[in-house]
Design a protein with these regions (language model features):
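Conserved "HGTGT" condensation-loop signature of ketosynthase/thiolase-family condensing enzymes
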Residues: 1-92, 109-113, 123-145
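Active-site nucleophile and cofactor-binding loops and adjacent substrate-binding regions
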Residues: 90-100
Length: 145
């Protein structure tokens, strides 16, 4: 990071030891025609919260990837409402193959920077359950900014 006032280069502060992944969970996998993307996301979130030993009310940040099988422009907002939480920090990301790593980096920075204490990092989709080429194209078209 550059310091414009003095022209000097400032050392970045390490966040090592300040943030941690404290829980992990997953949903059913495979063809699950009776489950919506939201239901699958909820399964994974509940499992992660149980693994972490924290309550739903303690989640104050949500980062999600886009869901191709669900037409939500801001999946993090739609999921938060579905899951019954009101985060102060939220975003939906799509960075191709780097989405998961990017979400974890942003979550760590948000926690270290004081924007949130517990960030739910979530990716969910239902690609084996009825995602047609038309639905995929429509989802991508409707989600663009």
């Amino acid at each position: 990071m550059a310091n414009r006032a003095s022209g000097a280069i400032a050392r970045q502060r390490s966040i090592r030891g300040q943030v941690a992944i404290v829980g992990a969970g997953r949903s059913e996998v495979g063809r699950v025609p009776d489950k919506s993307v939201m239901a699958l996301a909820s399964q994974a979130a509940k499992a992660a919260l149980a693994d972490a030993g924290i309550k739903r009310s303690q989640i104050d940040g949500v980062l999600t990837s886009s869901a191709f099988a669900a037409p939500f422009h801001r999946f993090s907002v739609a999921f938060s409402e579905y899951f019954g939480i009101v985060p102060t920090f939220s975003n939906t990301l799509q960075v191709s193959g780097a989405t998961a790593a990017t979400m974890f980096n942003i979550a760590a920075a948000a926690i270290a920077g004081g924007l949130a204490e517990n960030v739910l990092v979530l990716g969910a989709d239902s690609l084996l359950t009825g995602l047609s080429p038309d639905l995929a194209l429509r989802s991508m078209t409707e989600s663009r900014d």
